UniProtKB/Swiss-Prot annotation:
Lineage: Eukaryota, Fungi, Dikarya, Ascomycota, Saccharomycotina
Name of the molecule in the record: Ubiquitin carboxyl-terminal hydrolase 4
Function recorded in the entry: Ubiquitin thioesterase that acts at the late endosome/prevacuolar compartment to recover ubiquitin from ubiquitinated membrane proteins en route to the vacuole. Also removes ubiquitin from soluble proteins targeted to proteasomes. Is essential to maintain a normal level of free ubiquitin. Required for promoting coordination of DNA replication and avoids DNA overreplication.
Domain USP: 525-885
Primary residence: cytoplasm
Active site: C534, H842
């Protein structure tokens, strides 16, 4: 009967468990909530629910498993919104005021949104259909597995022989192992036998972190008391521990989240993964997570004297061989699998979905706010509380929230061929060397038109002569089966045309400036501090001094290149709001010129857009300006990435890698850059991204292994002492490092770990170089020494210039230089400064506004010319901005 609670049947058991997941999401947050934040969460989640319903409608219903997973995901989204609307919001203190006669205009608008959502939930007829599908699917599963379950019960009753010798505890040996482990540095590897010793004597003091997909973790993992799973695809190397906790852990069970929150209380944290995974992605992510815990634990710092962070250097197979126990598959994982890797998981996850679809497309009829169509728009007032679990993109390797699998290391599996175009057809000719130092970053063999700044003083180089190649299947071993239509047309490849001289579209909601208009790129406007947002303000002032970038956003050209199919993009949310903030500042400066009253510009709407993509920026807490800078550049890149929907590149076969190692760094890095452009191709890449090589070398046989990493911000170490020069930091960055015994490289030639070295070399220098001075050590102590940085910086000696003329098979002409022609001289145009400690302090900036205005000091709303000639050379400098000069 209606209104009377019925006993839970087996058919409804799944719905109850799904509801409990929604309850955890809503009621497991101890942060004080306010009405606006909760409604924003409701609107975002309801949009996710609608997206799932559309997918269900378009799905082939013969694929019952996929349909069921989508229904479960939709059901959870619905229940989350239902809980907020019926159980949370009515009990907020602000709700009573907002529904009364003394409600403010803002509160009245929020209540309209509340009732709109309430009405939608009440009239929703799709949820009953979704519930029925979930129940029917469970019935089918139970029937299919009944016989299997019976056999499993019979097998489980059989007693297996026990090897008592294997489990006999040798206390002296174990204590010796533990003493050896305690002498290791954090970041070192341990063997299976050493981990077994720890678990026998120190299990309560041990936290294990499994860095594999949730499906693999549920199937089998190391059996111990305190263990959690952090999926390798759920984080990027640029994350902090707070982002891991607030974003990557969203789909994790409550007890795993609590264990991770207590991580600094454990004496040992051990990371492990599947070392036999072919792409090596899991291990690369394990190393990234290790670095995050050691170097970017800002929320809950890890004291190396109390907690050792180590990793298991053996495989799971060896763990079993050494007598280690494995915890097998849990049936509950079939019901509430919340993996965020692969396709069709239960939540799929909240973090990734909110990255991609947290905000609908910007309403193109309004420039005032960011509406959440078709619901009433949330007013653009300040948000200062609430950090409900939210997704993040990390956006690429932001570098890049949730990330896709990384760029596989260059070249095709089968042979050493330049797989430059990945899934595109091979070109019919190879351009010769490009002598233009600022040539745009276009993939080889495409007909991309360069995306050049209108202010670029250097004209495009004339089209170079073409060279026919008789052996041009080096592009890919699949080239002979590619559709020939692609060879005749490049229309499907990403296009970055030159900036037009007229407005890009008639119906654009944003005011745009044509390239023929005079743009005052030296505008000076203060930014309001929206509550510890100085870390945003200082970076915005410096970024907006990059003339090539701001012209593209001021004239609206950027909008033509937003790729809504980009896997890691925000579908234009970040780019549109970045452009709006820029135009607000530009117009404020213009009104100042004609005598109108002027003030500082608010960054609230822009900050809310950032928060919708990455929850790290959601509340009013202080953040690292470096993290924000990386997030912003990577976010803009993913929005504008013309190749953002392309599949990741294949990894090298051992034979191909060995062949690549025989090439010079100059040639090998250029090949890698061409491949990189097939998955990452945007104006941000063209303006800001560089590349460095990390080379391991065996000291016994001299074998090398080199990986190539793209960067938007180059982090250089600051040597200890009273003071140093910036070039000293680059010397430190590029010096050869002798690896410790426990860090030694497994040499493929020697077939064992050998004494080895590691060396970083800069292989590509960008047009605009952003340098981060690494002032914080692993213990979060700040190095405050004065780094003397010059106004003109020559980095030519640090650029790889080892070309010996040797090219890979099949290439008869030089690979395009892409602007990599020495010398590499840079002029300083911005400096973000930090005062205080990592946990508190203040950010300001110095920006060069051109010959007329000179250097300007910015401190939120306050700005002024520098008071003496070299005031901008500050002992507090933290992030430096340099622009390449060509004459």
């Amino acid at each position: 009967m209606p209104g009377i609670e019925q006993p839970v049947s087996r058919k409804n058991e799944t719905l109850v468990k799904l509801s409990s997941l929604a309850d955890e999401f809503v009621f497991n947050d101890e942060v004080q909530l306010n009405l606006q934040d909760v409604l924003q969460e409701c609107v975002d989640t309801y949009q996710n629910y609608q997206d799932e319903v559309k997918k269900i409608k378009n799905m082939d219903h013969t694929e019952s498993e996929k349909v069921s997973e989508l229904c479960k995901s939709a059901y959870i989204y619905y229940k989350i919104v239902h809980n907020f609307i019926t159980k949370v919001i009515p009990h907020l203190p602000e709700f009573e005021v907002a529904t009364g006669p003394k409600a403010s205009k803002l509160q009245a608008e929020l209540i309209k949104i509340y009732y709109s959502l309430f009405s939608r939930l009440e009239s929703d007829k799709k949820i009953s259909y979704i519930k029925n599908i979930i129940i029917k699917h469970m019935d089918t599963q139970e029937n299919n597995h009944s016989v299997e379950s019976h056999e499993q019960v019979k097998l489980s009753n059989k007693k297996l022989p026990v090897n008592r010798d294997a489990i006999e505890i040798d206390k002296d040996s174990i204590l010796q192992d533990i003493r050896y482990i305690n002498g290791k540095r954090s970041g070192s590897g341990i063997s299976c036998s050493e981990l077994l010793s720890l678990m026998k004597m120190k299990e309560d003091s041990l936290l294990l972190i499994d860095v594999r997909p949730k499906l693999e973790y549920d199937a089998h993992h190391i059996k111990t008391k305190n263990i959690i799973c952090i999926e390798p695809i759920s984080f990027k190397e640029s994350y902090s521990d707070q982002q891991i906790e607030k974003t990557s852990m969203i789909p994790s069970p409550k007890h795993e989240i609590q264990l991770f929150q207590r991580r600094s209380e454990f004496q040992y944290i051990i990371l492990y993964t599947d070392l036999e995974e072919k792409s090596n992605f899991y291990f690369q992510q394990l190393k990234s997570l290790l670095e995050i815990l050691l170097q970017r634990s800002f929320l809950r710092p890890i004291d190396d004297r109390k907690t050792k962070v180590l990793f298991l250097s053996d495989s799971l197979q060896n763990w079993i061989k050494n007598g280690g126990e494995i915890d097998k598959s849990q049936e509950v994982s079939k019901i509430r699998n919340r993996s965020i890797s692969g396709s069709g998981p239960l939540l799929n996850s909240l973090s990734e979905r909110k990255t991609i679809g947290a905000f609908p497309d910007i309403n193109r009829n309004s420039t005032k706010q960011m509406p959440i169509s078709p619901l009433p728009s949330l007013p653009g007032s300040e948000r200062t509380v609430a950090t409900p679990p939210n997704g993040s993109s990390t956006l690429g390797r932001i570098n890049s929230p949730v990330t896709h699998y990384p760029k596989a290391p260059l070249i095709n599996d089968s042979e050493f061929h330049l797989n430059i175009n990945n899934n595109h057809s091979p070109p019919t000719h190879l351009p010769s060397k490009d002598n233009n130092p600022l040539a745009s970053s276009m993939p080889i063999g495409s007909d991309h038109k360069p995306f050049m700044s209108p202010q670029n003083s250097l004209p495009l180089a004339p089209k170079p002569p073409t060279l026919e190649s008789k052996n041009y299947n080096f592009i890919s071993d699949r080239s002979n089966i590619i559709d020939q239509k692609q060879n005749r047309s490049r229309s499907l490849e990403p296009q970055l045309p030159p900036i037009p001289s007229t407005l890009i579209r008639k119906n654009s909601p944003e005011k745009t400036l044509s390239c023929n208009q005079m743009m005052d790129t030296s505008f000076t406007v203060g930014l309001e501090n929206m509550g510890n947002s100085c870390y945003i303000n200082c970076i915005i002032q410096c970024i907006f001094a990059t003339t090539e970038l701001i012209k593209i956003f001021l004239n609206g050209t950027y909008a033509k290149h937003i790729n809504k199919q980009s896997k890691l993009g925000s579908k234009g949310v970040l780019s549109h709001n970045f452009a709006k903030l820029l135009k607000d500042m530009y117009e404020e400066n213009s009104s100042k010129k004609i005598g109108k009253k002027h003030g500082a510009v608010k960054t609230l709407q822009f900050k809310m857009a950032c928060a919708s993509v990455n929850s790290l920026f959601k509340d009013a807490s202080q953040q690292d300006c470096l993290e924000f800078c990386q997030f912003l550049l990577d976010g803009l890149h993913e929005d504008l990435n013309q190749c953002g929907a392309n599949p990741p590149l294949k990894e090298l076969s051992p034979e191909a890698e060995k062949m690549r190692e025989n090439l010079s760094l100059r040639v090998a890095s250029s090949i890698e850059w061409e491949r990189y452009l097939t998955t990452d191709f945007s104006i941000i890449v063209d303006l800001f991204q560089g590349q460095y090589a990390s080379q391991l070398r065996c000291k016994v046989c001299n074998r090398t292994s080199t990986t190539y990493q793209a960067f938007s911000v180059l982090s250089v170490p600051v040597p200890s002492g009273k003071s140093c020069g910036l070039l000293d930091c680059f010397i430190e960055f590029t010096k050869t490092e002798n690896l410790e015994v426990d860090e030694q490289w497994f040499c493929p030639s020697c077939k064992k770990k050998q004494p080895s070295t590691k060396k970083l070399t800069i292989t590509r220098l960008p047009r605009n170089l952003i340098i981060h001075l690494k002032r914080f050590d692993n213990m979060m102590n700040k190095n405050n020494i004065f780094v003397r940085y010059p106004q003109i910086l020559d980095l030519t000696p640090f650029w790889a210039n080892d070309s010996d003329g040797k090219l890979p098979p099949g290439i008869t002409d030089e690979i395009p230089a892409r602007g990599q022609v020495p010398p590499f001289n840079y002029r300083l145009y911005g400096a973000a400064c930090h005062f205080g400690t990592l946990y508190g302090g203040h950010y300001t900036s110095y920006v060069d506004k051109g010959p007329e205005k000179g250097w300007i000091y910015f401190d939120d709303t306050v700005y002024r010319p520098v008071r003496f000639q070299n005031e901008f050379i500050s002992p507090s400098a933290y992030v430096l901005f340099y622009h390449r000069i060509t004459s």
